[in-house]
Amino acid sequence: QRRDREVVAAYDLRSGLQHWEHGWTGLFQESMGGPGPRATPTWSDGKLYPLGALGELQALNASNGELLWRRNILEDAGVGNLTWGMSGAPLVDDGRVIVFPGGRNNKSVIAYNAADGSIAWTSQDDQGGYASPQLATLADKRQLLYFSGKRIVGLDPADGSLLWEHPWYSNNDINSAQPIQVDDDHLWVSSSYGHGSELLKIVHRGDGFV
């Protein structure tokens, strides 16, 4: 955060000199976390994908900071911001940039085409969360995982279709810790404020997963 702008900057590792800077107007702040973006920019195939706390998603040329395309994920989902802002880092997979704004109308999870920012697919009606979407292979199935304010969910990353879900209710719906894959079938989830943790076993049963 630099005054009223969210900023992405690149520095030389040896000298510390700034190579380039790119920013946009936006100031998110609240008393506990302070001002500024929360999510770590994601690098993939020569491009950088920063997500601002107010939902501004951009694709940049990583070598010079040139803007390639932009979207606002909250506007695309038709949903308001979370109390502590957009925090989950974008996930890049198979030519798509996947984010989790939360919301209704089957737009909780949005996959954008990395080439031009057009929407590839949307999925789910869910409350937003603070953890980043992630990939895992569980029960011999490659999956897209996201941790909402109410549940942990596994989707097919190709089209966003639901594979399985497990309810997870915590104080104030604050789920911010990344789920951890323990082995080929088990996933560990946890939440703060005294809620605790669970070890889940994902099983392929019939045509689906539990």
What are these regions (language model features)?
Residues 1-210:
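Noncatalytic, solvent-exposed loop/strand surfaces
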